[in-house]
Amino acid sequence: MSQSISAQSGYTLPVFACASAIAAVETLLTSNCPDSVTLELLEPARTAEIAIEQGALLGHHRALAITRSEPGNNLDLTRHTPVWAEVEFTPGEGKLIIQGGEGIGKQLDREGQAAIYSYAQRLLRHHLQPYISGDQTLMVSLILPLGRTLATRTSNAAFGVVEGLSLLGTSGIAQPLSAPEQLAEFQQHLTSAAQQHQCLVFCLGENGLDLARQWGVPLDQMVKTANWLGSLFVAAAAVGVQEILLLGYHGKLIKLAGGIFHTHHHLADGRLEILTAQAVQAGLPYPLVQELGQAPTTEAGLKLLRHWQTEQNCPWVSKIYQAMADTVDRRSEEYVYKVSQHQLKVGSLLFDGDRQPVAISTQGQAMADKLGMTIPET
């Protein structure tokens, strides 16, 4: 059976992983692999029918099923990649154990724990727990045979995920992050959120959304922005938003400190140049500034600053990144006023590749307090 996917969007990897797992369990219980499975996405509250490519028994207590990722009309490197789930029932106490197999990334900051994040975990538990009786344990191993290869074409390593892809996302619907035709959809979401709140949180990508939720931002105050920060700043001011808290990866938000308001690297970069300029202003010794400028990435530059901070007992990270966060605020407010003559207060919260906060601006802290956020110490 075909999958019910709109012309504009498909489904995220967690949906296909869950569908494979459901099909594998059904194969194990009935000795027949279904042609498709229908599952609840939870986010949003709708169902999806996912085609099952194949499935097979691997013994009396084990089975395997396979789907293929279909992200819709997105420029997504996971298109058509196989998603396997192997399941096994063992004696137990009604538990569900979810494991990452080959091609599922490992989180360096969590001792190699599989990069299967909260939405994927929730989706799997919602659909698989009903199959488990009180004297059983269900073991589910998720496998992306091409995951290790595909991961070399992503920025996963910058976020501390190695050897494969993440099952990341806050929704079952896959939306392109950088396709221009999606800007109108983001603006529509922004307009809807602005009708309820004068303070919103702009979240860059899925990591920003996931952390916003973890740190206590109400769902109806989150707006996903992708790379169109400039356009969405102006749109927010035009519909009456008073305050925006930016929540994003430092390697993206650093561009705003340099006056770059479309953050896709194909259009503009300059990240290391901006970082070194901030370092000079903070008083970093010139030989270290030169070394910083040779870092391959901003994440590597941040690690150098942390090393020198420990070595010299000087708070280089907070000095440089606090000033940078405040500069992001100022340049953003100036941009909005220059383009639209509207006043908009901006705060910023930058996180690193380990998804930990690096710096929060003065205005950002005030907004976070107002929102009731609980943020780990920087």
Curated annotation (Swiss-Prot):
Record EC number: 2.1.1.195
A Pfam family assignment: CbiD
GO molecular function: cobalt-precorrin-5B C1-methyltransferase activity
Catalytic activity, reaction form: Co-precorrin-5B + S-adenosyl-L-methionine = Co-precorrin-6A + S-adenosyl-L-homocysteine
UniProt keyword list: Cobalamin biosynthesis, Methyltransferase, S-adenosyl-L-methionine, Transferase
Enzyme's top EC category: transferase
Pathway in which this enzyme or protein is active: Cofactor biosynthesis; adenosylcobalamin biosynthesis; cob(II)yrinate a,c-diamide from sirohydrochlorin (anaerobic route): step 6/10
Coiled coil: none
Superkingdom: Bacteria
Biological process annotations from GO: anaerobic cobalamin biosynthetic process; methylation
Similarity comment: family membership: Belongs to the CbiD family.
Matching HAMAP family: CbiD
Protein name: Cobalt-precorrin-5B C(1)-methyltransferase
Source organism: Synechocystis sp. (strain ATCC 27184 / PCC 6803 / Kazusa)
Gene from which the chain derives: cbiD
